[in-house]
Amino acid sequence: MPTTFQEIPRKRPSTPLLDRAVTPVGLRRLGEAELETLADELRLELLYTVGQTGGHFGAGLGVIELTIALHYVFDTPDDRLVWDVGHQAYPHKILTGRREQMGTLRQKDGIAAFPRRAESEYDTFGVGHSSTSISAALGMAIAARLQGSDRKAIAVIGDGALTAGMAFEALNHAPEVDANMLVILNDNDMSISRNVGGLSNYLAKILSSRTYASMREGSKKVLSRLPGAWEIARRTEEYAKGMLVPGTLFEELGWNYIGPIDGHDLPTLIATLRNMRDLKGPQFLHIVTKKGKGFAPAEVDPIGYHAITKLDPLNAPAAAPKKASGPKYSGVFGEWLCDMAAADPRLVGITPAMKEGSDLVAFSERFPLRYFDVAIAEQHAVTFAAGMACEGAKPVVAIYSTFLQRGYDQLVHDVAVQNLDVLFAIDRAGLVGEDGPTHAGSFDLSYLRCIPGMLVMTPSDENELRKMLSTGHLYNGPAAVRYPRGNGPNAVIEKDLEPIEIGKGIVRRQGSKTAFLVFGVQLAEALKVAEKIDATVVDMRFVKPLDEALVREIAGGHELLVTVEENAIMGGAGAAVSEFLARENILKSVLHLGLPDVYVEHAKPAQMLAECGLDEAGIEASVRERMTLLAL
């Protein structure tokens, strides 16, 4: 296994065992003594595959042994295997008949970055967001019981995902219904416990064995006849285990806890899983793994190698020269946050486990006492911000659009109803590319504009983003600024912290007959099309409050209004324009351009925009078609 870039051979080595393990059926024909070699081959395969396509990397390297052991011991797909989030599922895809398709990973019309039910019968539950696996597996376990089936449901969840409240809701529920399921905690950060080594591995084999389980149940029946005897025995067992393993919390919830064991020790994994396969009721196995296992750079820098673009410099094609572009929108936000924090001591920054992605690293270093990473807990993040706002703080919640959906009730009930000063910096708005529909920010304008008192802004470039962040920070009430992934058009950024006038759009180009009303970063494409057809272009800037006076004026002087947004057309910014026109009894032809009523599948962002008709060519074609229909 290569441990550095320089050790990556130009020619892919042979993988005789992996060639036989095309599916779990072939895997189960291998002898146990061959599985260590298979693990080496699978790691190498993952290195080459992700090096070619890009994608999530470190997590998959860390679960090679676990993936092999699960498909070796359990009768998948009849036994239901649910991967939480899905970042670690590439080895699973390779072993379940998709090895030859891995070269299309995350590409248009290729296989998805996450498990998808439509892609394989081995993908029992579609994922992308975190902390859903235990609830899903619990539902599957209860359904199996109702159907008279003894199939097992297994959830694999990481220690990071276990921080979300939803995971604990399921952990609390499963023992109440005595679900026949197994939860595997993949502890790759050692945030819950340290690996206690061989003694813990040995203890896990004993405690998971059928002999121990039978003795335990037999003792329970005998001692239950003696007043207090079983309770004393239970506590003695708990204290003895507690001296070696950290499972008290899970035991108290009603789970049979085993571990922690070494997640890279295949013989121990297989023996323990075989034992636990035959146990009834809710079972909990705690394994400790190393993210990036087997590739030194990823082991040293697990955050940097969580996801990669191109890894193999020897085999990758030469990169095309990049077009000149401005800074990343997230970088503009991060710089503004530091500047405003220096000017306003009331500002605090909150993120649900997205410090690097949302560009809060500099803020966390400069203002550590005002920085709060609440982990994967979006609901808590929003209400935590609401509580701080009640006491005079000015919280800024930096969150991806797709994850704000998870805290929507808190946004409405805890922030908006109380009209609290919370600013939501909504990153990754619109189409995000290769991660596909689970990560797209397709709906935020629709679900935000219906909230009374909410200020909703859509910058068209980096400078407007900075201005709107200041506007939202100074606004009395809840505010949201949504901006896309990637780089801006290289606009000149004014470094002051002055707000802009709320609810006012700007006419960027004056034309005739046709007018573009643009909400967001498609302004540049609209301006290019407008030059060809002599159209007016308006940078609307505010979805709520809508600049109704400007819309009325533009409607009065043009025959066709074209709204443009990178959000679902249904209920979006364009819908706000049509609602206003209808309310004012203004009859005007309106063309809405935005995201269609489908989930846009993974591809390059440019390909996705073209598919939705939101690139220059698509916008021009749609507008010309409507103009022809209207004889303009």
Swiss-Prot record:
Cofactor note: Binds 1 Mg(2+) ion per subunit. Binds 1 thiamine pyrophosphate per subunit.
Pathway(s) annotated for this protein in UniProt: Metabolic intermediate biosynthesis; 1-deoxy-D-xylulose 5-phosphate biosynthesis; 1-deoxy-D-xylulose 5-phosphate from D-glyceraldehyde 3-phosphate and pyruvate: step 1/1
GO cellular component term of the entry, any: cytosol
Residues annotated to bind thiamine diphosphate: 87, 128-130, 160-161, 188, 295, 378
Ligand binding (Mg(2+)): 159, 188
Pfam families referenced in this protein's UniProt entry, alphabetically: DXP_synthase_N, Transket_pyr, Transketolase_C
GO molecular function, one term: 1-deoxy-D-xylulose-5-phosphate synthase activity
Catalytic activity: D-glyceraldehyde 3-phosphate + pyruvate + H(+) = 1-deoxy-D-xylulose 5-phosphate + CO2
Documented EC number(s): 2.2.1.7
Cofactor: Mg(2+); thiamine diphosphate
Membrane-spanning residues: none
Enzyme class: transferase
Keyword Amino-acid biosynthesis found: no
InterPro entries on file: Dxylulose-5-P_synthase, THDP-binding, Transketo_C/PFOR_II, Transketolase-like_Pyr-bd, Transketolase_BS, Transketolase_C
Source organism, top-level taxon: Bacteria
Keywords: Isoprene biosynthesis, Magnesium, Metal-binding, Thiamine biosynthesis, Thiamine pyrophosphate, Transferase
Gene Ontology biological process: 1-deoxy-D-xylulose 5-phosphate biosynthetic process; isopentenyl diphosphate biosynthetic process, methylerythritol 4-phosphate pathway; terpenoid biosynthetic process; thiamine biosynthetic process
Similarity section: Belongs to the transketolase family. DXPS subfamily.
Assembly behavior: Homodimer.
Function text: Catalyzes the acyloin condensation reaction between C atoms 2 and 3 of pyruvate and glyceraldehyde 3-phosphate to yield 1-deoxy-D-xylulose-5-phosphate (DXP).
Name of the protein: 1-deoxy-D-xylulose-5-phosphate synthase
Organism field: Pseudomonas fluorescens (strain SBW25)
Gene designation: dxs
